[in-house]
Amino acid sequence: KYEQTKVLMVPNKNYHGKKVNLDRLEIVYIDDVSTKMMEYEQGNIDMCDLSTSLLDQYKDSDLKDEITQVTPLGTYFLSIKDTDPVLSNKAVREAISLAINRKELCNTVLNGAAQPASSFLNPGVPGHDDKLKAYEHNVTKAKKVLADAGISNPTFTCKVRQNEEKIATALQAYLKEAGITMNVETIDAGIWSSARAAGELQATIVGWFPLYADADNQMYTYYYSENAVGKGVFYNNPEFDSLMKEARESTDSDKRVELYKKADYILSREDYGTIPLYYGKLQFVAKPYVKNAKLGNLIYHLYNIDIDLSKK
């Protein structure tokens, strides 16, 4: 049964497999993250996601043992229009990356629910280079890169949705220290989506999650030249495209991994065609009597979920 604010699921009596554990499963939609946790604390819901913005409030509370944290396959990054008059200059893109304090961003702004990025590919995706360290934070070097290129006070606008506003504001402060002006504008999600597809955004913040652990699904879908146009980034490097195409056509898994490592390095460390920020973590809370609660790559796995009535 579906209603605007919830979905009620009951067992299918004709299902061919084993009997399910629960007599009913109710999924309730609650937009406000604080209201959602209030409902959880009052016992009106048995499990729910815990927003990163509230993690600091709950991680040392009485609910700390009810929190489960997972790392999905995605990467959060500063998505930039590589053909923009300001951002088309590689020196500007490199300086932006150097100016960002990813460690502080993860520990303070994101309350520890993130890991500083070292490449575009997530560590859980074959093709991620585990030997790479997190991107360097060096404001002095960022200023020198700009000075050597004869650039002073580069200015651009980063338009974001409300969820990314806090991140954008932090980036704005980091870039200011290096003499880079990033104006931040928060826009409606629908307008954002249309503007990105039309290539109207100089820069924005994106979390990009592959549907499964394969670099083709994470990197080809966003930065292969034909796809990059629709994402509003217009990245175009024939060498990168060639590596991606070769990896797509290969059936040798080890070879594919090496090809993706090279492609990622070109994209995110030679061209700075993208500015990876962090690998986000997700968390949810579940009552002690909830059994087999799992969260995979952005998806709750509910097929084995059960309730231990002796603990309720």
Short names for language-model regions:
Residues K1-V10, V257-E258, L298-K312:
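The feature preferentially marks the first beta-strand/turn patch immediately downstream
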Residues S51-D62, P210-A215:
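A ligand-binding cleft/hinge motif common to bilobed small-molecule-binding domains
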Residues G17-L22, Y58-T71, S79-K90, P123-K144, ...:
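Short, solvent-exposed loop/beta-turn-alpha elements that line the ligand-binding surface or hinge
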